[in-house]
Amino acid sequence: MTNEFLHFDRISRERWQQLHRKTTPPLTEEELNSIKSFNDEISLQDVMDIYLPLTNLIQIYKRAKEDLAFSKGIFLQKTLKKQPFIIGVSGSVAVGKSTTSRLLQILLSRTFENAKVELVTTDGFLYPNSVLQEHDLLNRKGFPESYNMELLLNFLDHLKNGQNYQVPVYSHEIYDIVPDQTQTIQVADFVIVEGINVFQNPQNERLYITDFFDFSIYVDAEVENIEKWYLDRFGKLLDLARRDSKNYYHRFTKEPVEDIMKMARNIWKSINLVNLKDYIEPTRNRAELILHKAHNHEIDEIYLKK
């Protein structure tokens, strides 16, 4: 164990799954398949072993937050405004953040009766391609400078104050922000914020994004596994794009597969791997919980901050 994990408790999958009583999964196999990323692997057994104990843990943190707010209100002699419980989910591209986030959205909405759970990805806070091109940043897309961090902080501030907010919508099909389209994030009991940059500190800002989170999760894996998953996903995106001329990846389908996959490997090494090592992975220890995935996508270890 490196020094980075000294303030974490390492918990094996076998030990973790014992922290929740055996029960029926609160979703079906069909529902699970519908929410998983198309290059990801997850089973109902994973839901039972990993995510139901995690939901219990989140319940403990939520109760502690409410107790603190109640006590603080007594001390200040006023009623404090109810705030959503905000969960940050981070990790590399292609590691399975989206699957984790969508699954948590379902589990929380069914664990807490009548709970409203919103999910937003930070892809919507990328600058549009036109802005990135204007500032010669298109090849830095996904790096910290390609995000409108001021807008992201403003969004989180509105969330904390119990206010609705309209966020831009990003499309992987067109590889850009969708013009004139927004997603309204309404006042909710839980808000899950998912993205590679959610633990990063905005430049020249006194506020840290993690200051807004009540709980935070980093989805982790060995670099060689993430690279394989990234290339698998790229290949599947190409297959989908062959049938859709409007898809951003359609332009690549006319080239030999070997050439395109060579390009994908170069993109991984020159962009995604650099971003992971320089900006994403260094934020890992800011998470409250780390879910480590093995080569088969199965979570084999959990690290919980002491």
Curated annotation (Swiss-Prot):
Annotated metabolic or biological route of this protein: Cofactor biosynthesis; coenzyme A biosynthesis; CoA from (R)-pantothenate: step 1/5
Catalytic activity: (R)-pantothenate + ATP = (R)-4'-phosphopantothenate + ADP + H(+)
Protein's name according to its UniProt entry: Pantothenate kinase
Entry GO terms, CC: cytoplasm
Organism of this sequence: Streptococcus gordonii (strain Challis / ATCC 35105 / BCRC 15272 / CH1 / DL1 / V288)
Chief localization: cytoplasm
GO terms of molecular function: ATP binding; pantothenate kinase activity
Keyword annotations from UniProtKB, A to Z: ATP-binding, Coenzyme A biosynthesis, Cytoplasm, Kinase, Nucleotide-binding, Transferase
Family: Belongs to the prokaryotic pantothenate kinase family.
Known EC number: 2.7.1.33
Keyword check for Kinase: yes
Record CDD domains: PanK (cd02025)
Subcellular location: Cytoplasm
GO biological process, one term: coenzyme A biosynthetic process
Binding-site positions, ATP: 91-98
Pfam families in alphabetical order: PRK
Cited InterPro entries: P-loop_NTPase (IPR027417), PanK (IPR004566), PRK/URK (IPR006083)
Uppermost EC category: transferase
